Amino acid sequence: MAPSAISTSPPPTDRVSSSLASYKGYDHVHWYVGNAKQAASYYITRMGFKRIAYRGLETGCRSVCSHVVRNGDITFILTSPLRSLDQVDRFPPEEQELLKEIHAHLEKHGDGVKDVAFEVDSVDSVFYAATNNGAKIVSQPRTLEDDNGQVRVATIQTYGETTHTLVERGSYHGAFLPGYRMETGVEDPISQLLPGVHLNRIDHCVGNQDWDEMDKVCEYYEKALGFHRFWSVDDKQICTEYSALKSIVMASPNEVVKMPINEPAKGKKQSQIEEYVDFYNGAGVQHIALLTDDIIRDITNLKARGVEFIKVPDTYYEDIKVRLKKAGLTLHEDFETIRSLDILIDFDEGGYLLQLFTKHLMDRPTVFIEIIQRHNFSGFGAGNFKSLFEAIEREQALRGNLV
């Protein structure tokens, strides 16, 4: 189904966007978690990531620890505090502030995404264009250095307590960043016993907002970061009997970075967006979509590794089969295999996408992962939103949150 609200406006051509046409894609996603070692183990054992870098006591970092894992070009940093709040006075001011920040983030949000980092050609041009147009500074541009070269970084604020770090790698040839011990080649023994998961890159990263906050956030991306409105749907298109939402996808000038922004809309009961904002205690990253070139292989293997996905009712496939036949569209993949794996299908006259969503990654019903495969289709599954919402509402009802 082609979304009826795709933006027809071209990317902005003012001085902001011209300074920002240097986005290269997502660099990494930084999570604050209660136990980084265990969280890293989850992504390694369940989702086929590999350990690539570490920072902690053994590297001279006495206040926090970080485990870095990667699958394809998808990199997650998982960071935890090593000390309690009553011990912060032992550390220099910068480390004190970091410890306080992590503890406060965990107390307020639970495990969640703190930073979505973008790789850029020039940190300085993106940073100063952003800050000159209203972006809040978290950290000024600075250069990190080790034997593998230099990396330039800077950080700005986005919605809620989430941030965007800008990363300029230049000729740096280390596995991750200066300050981390490289662990490439460190193979988890369990990887020899489990089927492989071969993901490509981050496709998009979705942020949930509270009531009436979406437009303000989108305007911030337009003004400060030079993004443009790539795609949008309203509550008439994304609704069930009980709940609804609105969504606008913001894209970088060259469209290599896409950041969908959601907000709740009026319905009979609490929507999944309201549930998220309630349990996350504010705006934040709802899910990260990971692109694959073989979703059947990867969903099959993720399920074999124990990853839990939402369940799609059989009636969905009876309906989609009729719609596909009417449109004269033939899938490259076997339809019955797609049905058996609960994979969702959306399409238009040009192509189609296949997607499936995990259940929430933690006990708080906040963050989850999407696995997505695209066949000449740049949309975001508008045709699946009703089925997806209904599946999520069934989970909400089990949690007692569909009220």
Curated annotation (Swiss-Prot):
Residue runs in coiled coils: none
Annotated keywords: Dioxygenase, Iron, Metal-binding, Oxidoreductase, Phenylalanine catabolism, Repeat, Tyrosine catabolism
Enzyme Commission code(s) on record: 1.13.11.27
Pathway per the UniProt entry: Amino-acid degradation; L-phenylalanine degradation; acetoacetate and fumarate from L-phenylalanine: step 3/6
Any single GO BP term: L-phenylalanine catabolic process
Reaction(s) catalysed by this chain's protein: 3-(4-hydroxyphenyl)pyruvate + O2 = homogentisate + CO2
Note describing how the cofactor binds: Binds 1 Fe cation per subunit.
Enzyme class at the top of the EC tree: oxidoreductase
GO molecular function, one term: metal ion binding
Disruption phenotype: Impairs growth on L-tyrosine as the sole carbon source and affects homogentisic acid and pyomelanin formation. Leads to increased sensitivity to reactive oxygen intermediates.
Complexes and interactors: Homodimer.
Role played: 4-hydroxyphenylpyruvate dioxygenase; part of the L-tyrosine degradation gene cluster that mediates the biosynthesis of the brownish pigment pyomelanin as an alternative melanin. The 4-hydroxyphenylpyruvate dioxygenase hppD catalyzes the conversion of 4-hydroxyphenylpyruvate to homogentisic acid (HGA). The protein hmgX is crucial for this conversion and thus, probably functions as an accessory factor to mediate specific activity of hppD. The homogentisate 1,2-dioxygenase hmgA is then involved in the cleavage of the aromatic ring of HGA and its conversion to 4-maleylacetoacetate.
Protein name as catalogued: 4-hydroxyphenylpyruvate dioxygenase
Organism of provenance: Aspergillus fumigatus (strain ATCC MYA-4609 / CBS 101355 / FGSC A1100 / Af293) (Neosartorya fumigata)
Name of the gene encoding the protein in the UniProt record: hppD
